[in-house]
Curated annotation (Swiss-Prot):
GO terms for biological process: cell differentiation; hormone-mediated signaling pathway; intracellular receptor signaling pathway; negative regulation of transcription by RNA polymerase II; positive regulation of transcription by RNA polymerase II. GO terms for cellular component: nucleus. The keyword Nucleus applies. Orphan nuclear receptor. SMART domains: ZnF_C4. Its main location: nucleus. Keywords: DNA-binding, Metal-binding, Nucleus, Receptor, Transcription, Transcription regulation, Zinc, Zinc-finger. Residues 57-83, 90-112, 138-147, 159-171 have a biased composition (Polar residues). Belongs to the nuclear hormone receptor family. It comes from Caenorhabditis elegans. Pfam families: zf-C4. A zinc finger (NR C4-type) spans 218-238, 267-285. This is Nuclear hormone receptor family member nhr-2.
Length: 472
C-alpha cells in the first residue's frame, strides 16, 4: 500500500477542541498514539511546551511532520525508528515517546494521575481467592496469588492504585481462605496457677453471714422484719394479720387438712404466697412463738359519753305543727307573690293564724301594718333565698346573698321556711325574748339535722343572719 502523507490528509474541523490537547480515554485506551494522526496545531503546541521546559533551544527551524511509512491503523504502536526520524529533523531536545500503551498530555511534565478505576472485566477465576484481599477489590485484572509470573506482576503494577508495591514471587506465600483461618486448631498449653487460695475458713464465714441475715428476716414469711412484734421478729404484714385474727377470734380451716405442712407442695408460708392459706399462716405464727396474751383486745379506754340532745317534747312539736299549717294555708312555697299588696295580705293572714305571734303584735290596724312593713323585707328575702319564688317586685339581692352564703343545698321545705319566718318575726317584734322563740329554734335545729346531714352548724349560721341583719 502507498504510504499516506499527514500534510496531504484532510482533517475535520474541530472548532470546540483545544489544539494540541488530545483527550485522554478514561478506560486507558490508546488515543492518537501514532504521530501520523496528530494535527499540525498539536505539533506546534508541543514544540512551544518543550521550549518552555528546556530554555535555550533553537526556534528558527521549522518543524515538519514525519512521513508515515506504514499504513495508518488505529491502536497501533509506533516503532522506535519513527520516533528517531521525527526527532532527527528537529534541533530541539525533546524526550522520546514512552513505549507504554498510554496517552501522554503535552501540557504536563508527567502523566496525570487517573481518578477512575480501570474497567472491570469478568475473567474466569482459576482458584478461590480470599474476599478480604484488598487488591481483588481494587482491580479484577490481578492474577491469582499462586501464579509466580513476573510479567503479571509488572502488568498489575500499572493498574493498582493506592496499594502497597507488588511483592516478588519469592516472598509470596499462599493465602488461605477465611474458613481455613478460623478453623485452624490452636494448641493451648495449660499452666499451673501462681497462687493457692485458702478455703479453710470459708464455711465459718458463710455461717456468720447467714446468721447476720437471719436477724433482719420475718420468722413467719421471710420478708424484711421491722422489729419484735408479740415476742417474735416479724414484718408488718404478719403482725397485722396476727392482731386481726386475735381481735376477731377467727377460726381458720385449711383446705389441705389437719396434716398440712409448710412446704411448696402444700401451703407455703413465704412472702409470695403467704396470703393463700390463712389457717397455715396463723398456725405458723403460733409455731414460731407469737403470744396471744400480748395482743391488747380493748385498745380504747372507757370515755364519758356526751349527753345527746334531748328530743323535742309534744308541746314543742304541736307549736311547730301549728306554725307550719298556718304557713302552708296562707303563703306556701309553691305560691308566687306577684306584688307588694299581695305580699302584705299574705303575711297578715299568716300572723293572725298563729296565736303565739298575733298576741305579740299591736291590735291597732295602722300599727299592725307598720309592724308588717318591718318584717316584710326579711320574709321576702327568706322566700327568694330558699324557694323558687323569684320576688320580681322587690329588690333584695344583698340579703339573699347573705342568707345563701356557705350553704350547699339552698332549697328548703315548707316547715323550714315557716320556722325561719316565725323566728325572724319574733326577733323584729320583741327581740326574741318570748318563750316560743326557744321552741322555734329547737324545732329548726331538729328539722335541719334530718334534711341537711352534711351541713354542720347550719342552724347556728342561719340564726345569726336573721332579724335586724336582713333589714339593713
Amino acid at each position: 500500500m502507498v504510504p499516506m502523507n499527514p500534510e496531504l490528509m484532510h482533517y475535520p474541523n474541530q472548532p470546540h477542541m483545544m489544539p494540541g490537547y488530545p483527550m485522554i480515554n478514561a478506560y486507558q485506551q490508546s488515543y492518537l498514539q501514532n504521530p501520523a494522526q496528530w494535527t499540525p496545531e498539536m505539533l506546534l503546541c508541543m514544540q512551544m511546551q518543550m521550549q518552555q521546559m528546556v530554555p535555550g533551544t533553537a526556534t528558527n527551524s521549522t518543524y515538519m511532520p514525519p512521513q508515515s511509512k506504514n499504513t495508518v491503523t488505529p491502536n497501533a504502536t509506533s516503532p522506535l525508528s519513527q520516533i528517531s526520524d521525527r526527532d532527527s529533523g528537529n534541533d530541539t531536545i525533546s524526550p522520546p515517546l514512552t513505549s507504554q500503551n498510554s496517552a501522554t498530555t503535552p501540557n504536563y511534565h508527567n502523566q496525570p494521575q487517573m481518578q477512575l478505576t480501570p474497567l472491570q472485566q469478568a475473567k474466569p477465576e482459576k482458584e478461590e481467592i480470599s474476599p478480604y484481599a484488598i487488591n481483588n477489590i481494587l482491580s479484577s485484572t490481578q492474577s491469582s496469588p499462586d501464579n509466580g509470573n513476573e510479567a503479571d506482576d509488572k502488568e498489575n503494577s500499572s493498574v493498582r492504585r493506592n496499594t502497597f508495591p507488588a511483592s516478588s514471587a519469592s516472598t509470596k506465600k499462599p493465602r488461605g481462605t477465611p474458613y481455613d483461618r478460623t478453623n485452624t486448631p490452636m494448641t493451648v498449653v495449660p499452666q499451673m496457677p501462681q497462687f493457692a487460695p485458702d478455703f479453710s475458713n470459708y464455711n465459718l464465714t458463710m455461717n456468720a453471714w447467714s446468721e447476720f441475715f437471719k436477724k433482719d428476716r420475718c420468722m413467719v414469711c421471710g420478708d424484711n422484719s421491722t422489729g419484735y412484734h408479740y415476742g417474735v421478729q416479724s414484718c408488718e404484714g404478719c403482725k397485722g394479720f396476727f392482731r386481726r385474727s386475735v381481735h376477731k377470734n377467727i377460726a381458720y380451716v385449711c383446705t389441705k387438712g389437719e396434716n398440712c405442712t409448710f412446704s411448696y407442695e402444700n401451703c407455703a408460708a413465704n412472702r409470695g404466697v403467704r396470703t393463700r392459706c390463712q389457717a397455715c399462716r396463723f398456725a405458723k405464727c403460733l409455731a414460731v412463738g407469737m403470744n396471744r396474751d400480748n395482743v391488747r383486745v380493748n385498745k380504747e379506754t372507757d370515755k364519758d359519753v356526751k349527753p345527746s340532745v334531748a328530743s323535742p317534747n309534744f308541746e314543742m312539736t304541736s307549736q311547730v305543727k301549728e306554725l307550719t299549717a298556718a304557713f302552708v294555708a296562707n303563703m306556701p312555697c309553691s305560691t308566687h307573690l306577684t306584688s307588694g299588696t299581695h305580699a302584705i295580705g299574705a303575711i297578715k293572714k299568716f300572723i293572725e293564724s298563729v296565736p303565739a305571734l298575733s298576741s305579740l303584735l299591736p291590735k291597732d290596724e295602722k300599727a299592725l301594718e307598720m309592724s308588717i312593713q318591718k318584717v316584710m323585707s326579711g320574709i321576702l328575702a327568706i322566700r327568694a333565698a330558699f324557694t323558687f319564688d323569684p320576688i320580681t317586685f322587690y329588690s333584695c339581692e344583698n340579703p339573699v346573698n347573705l342568707l345563701r352564703g356557705g350553704i350547699r343545698n339552698t332549697v328548703f321545705n315548707d316547715c323550714e321556711v315557716a320556722l325561719l319566718s316565725g323566728i325572724h318575726i319574733l326577733q323584729i317584734v320583741n327581740g326574741g325574748v318570748a318563750e316560743i322563740f326557744t321552741s322555734y329554734c329547737q324545732g329548726l335545729r331538729h328539722q335541719l339535722s334530718q334534711t341537711h346531714l352534711q351541713e354542720i352548724g347550719l342552724c347556728d349560721r342561719l340564726l345569726m343572719r336573721l332579724g335586724p341583719y336582713l333589714n339593713q
